[in-house]
Amino acid sequence: MERKRGREMNPPSADPPSATPVARANLPGSVAAAFHGRPCSQGTTTLKRVNERYKIVGFISSGTYGRVYKAEGKNGRTGEFAIKKFKPDKEGELQYSGISQSAIREMALCTELAHPNVVHTVEIILEEKCIFIVFEYAEHDLLQIIHHHNQPQRQAIPARTIKSILYQLLQGLVYLHRNWVMHRDLKPANIMVTSAGKVKIGDLGLARLFYKPLQSLFSGDKVVVTIWYRAPELLLGSRHYTPAVDLWAVGCIFAELLSLRPIFKGEEAKMDSKKTVPFQRNQMQKIVEIMGMPSKDRWPLLTAMPEYPQLSSLIAGNAARFARPQGGDGLDRWYNQTLINNQYPAGPGPETPGAEGLALLKQLLEYDPQKRLTAEKALEHRYFTEHGKPSDNCFEDSKIKYPVRRVSQEDNDIRTSSLPGTKRSGLPDDSLMGRPAKRLKEG
């Protein structure tokens, strides 16, 4: 696999002596480059109009940020691209306050990152009041692949495919964490897959630098990670969480690839009018039902969690139901039943996740974030070393033909389309201040 060379940050530690994270102001510096037409680290920036450089094929999706379109290059530019159009933070006849914090953060990080398993940013375009990020195009995402295996009847994703997907996902995550970037929103819809079977981490709108932040991560964004993939420490109100939240999400994604449905599918409690973050009681209950109760012996800092009294109340009200302590057989039963339901072969071998898959899943879904596997350690797990190294093409040897991403032809005017949705929650991020940082390298 061809890799770009450059300077690499030291891996995360308590106080690395010579690390120079991409923090503080290379982020606004990168964004400022977009406004002045200067090149960024990995992509270029321009004031030219989108339609001068790209032919819009159709509309893909919309979200809190704005809209995503599929495009083809023109005027000498070849290939297919995804163009994300950010809506202004507030736009109307009387006021215009710019673009959202998450948009600025994503632009800044995307222009500094370069790894085969992270979506590549081609360029940033400023046009009138809108910002456009042009990405390489991926024909699939994990959510689409999971849905395909559920229709018209349940058909398991091949074990080799799952292993390759996880291996590539973890390689991308190692790179992000080595460079002090926490993704904070890993889920199947944000994991892209190209037609060549290359897995790429996308959507860095909630990503955050975690090396000596100027304020707690909680104060910047009070709600992170989609509810079904949210780690226990986040559910329990941790103010100072770590990249381990991304590994819990990887465990949830692994389980979903196996079972074709979310393993912890809770109902999200919404914030009240005062923007108070509620205890996600139902989601925590879904976790405890399978994983058993977290214990102070296994998780020494459990009682220090802000929402620990709420957890105690939840457990006290369901004492018989949650009788198993962590380390019980709840996850074992779930895993073994999943393999039976989806007709994976019994015994060891490359065609089944096997006992190694269960061992990896347990270490990813560890309650205590300090004991949870890191991305680097996960790559060394015997699940990936038994029966040969995973392929860099998750579709290799697969006879399954996945449908390409659906593109709407009825809404392909990138200039005038309305931009529904609201910005992600969170306060201004003061980690976007300071001196320029050095360019990240691919790891």
Curated annotation (Swiss-Prot):
Domain Protein kinase: 54-384
Catalytic residues, chain numbering: 185 (proton acceptor)
Signal peptide range: none
PROSITE patterns to which the protein is assigned, alphabetical: PROTEIN_KINASE_DOM, PROTEIN_KINASE_ST
GO cellular component: mediator complex; nucleus
Reactions catalysed, as given in the entry: L-seryl-[protein] + ATP = O-phospho-L-seryl-[protein] + ADP + H(+); L-threonyl-[protein] + ATP = O-phospho-L-threonyl-[protein] + ADP + H(+); [DNA-directed RNA polymerase] + ATP = phospho-[DNA-directed RNA polymerase] + ADP + H(+)
Catalytic activity, EC: 2.7.11.22, 2.7.11.23
Subcellular localization(s) per the UniProt record: Nucleus
Keyword Nucleotide-binding set for record: yes
Highest taxon of source: Eukaryota
Similarity section: Belongs to the protein kinase superfamily. CMGC Ser/Thr protein kinase family. CDC2/CDKX subfamily.
Function, as annotated: Component of the srb8-11 complex. The srb8-11 complex is a regulatory module of the Mediator complex which is itself dependent transcription. The srb8-11 complex may be involved in the transcriptional repression of a subset of genes regulated by Mediator. It may inhibit the association of the Mediator complex with RNA polymerase II to form the holoenzyme complex. The srb8-11 complex phosphorylates the C-terminal domain (CTD) of the largest subunit of RNA polymerase II.
Name recorded for this polypeptide: Serine/threonine-protein kinase SSN3
